[in-house]
A protein has these predicted regions:
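Signals and flexible motifs at protein termini associated with secretion
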Residues: 1-167
């Protein structure tokens, strides 16, 4: 899998970034819908934090903030996806977005349009399988102030799941 890595260098005033050569990784892989695939149910999606693991976030909880060397800031998100059929397919399409609260209605509906990055991921690193649920950690996002993070996941069978986290 090909990766584009984005190192983060914290300053001494903020928590230190975990030691890692590659903190975020975008896969350069094709994603195609399989018109013959029909699976019941939806994908379940949860947003957490963590550069090395999935750590759930409580409602309204802000993820840990790491200061960048040029004065910006970053947080590490993690994603958990359930109801995945790894026996049927080996990749997912994941879109990670961040919005200002005024750009996203507070009524539980999907925000849009998408400004995030499209990530197509195979199973295996950086994804892990934990108790039947697929997890990815170390998704680097540049955030400042109040934010709505949104993750939308689609499998090759066309099933979609999404989650939002506000703070």
């Amino acid at each position: 899998m090909a990766c584009h890595c984005f190192p983060v260098f914290p300053n001494d005033d903020e928590p230190q970034s975990p030691e890692s050569e590659c903190i975020s990784c975008d896969a350069e892989l094709d994603f195609q819908l399989d018109e013959t695939c029909e699976l019941p149910g939806e994908l379940t999606v949860a947003i957490g934090e963590g550069p090395d693991d999935f750590l759930p976030l409580a409602d309204g909880e802000q993820p840990e903030f790491y200061a960048g060397f040029q004065g910006g800031g970053h947080s590490f998100f993690s994603v958990q996806v359930g109801n995945v059929e790894l026996s049927r397919y080996d990749r997912l399409e994941v879109v990670v977005d961040a919005y200002y609260p005024e750009e996203c209605p507070d009524d539980g509906t999907h925000c849009g349009p998408s400004y995030g990055r499209r990530v197509v991921v195979l199973d295996g690193e950086p994804w892990t399988l934990v108790d039947g649920v697929v997890q990815e950690h170390g998704i680097l996002m540049q955030l400042e102030g109040q934010t709505v993070a949104q993750v939308t996941v689609r499998d090759p069978c066309g099933r979609v799941g999404w989650a939002q986290h506000r703070w």
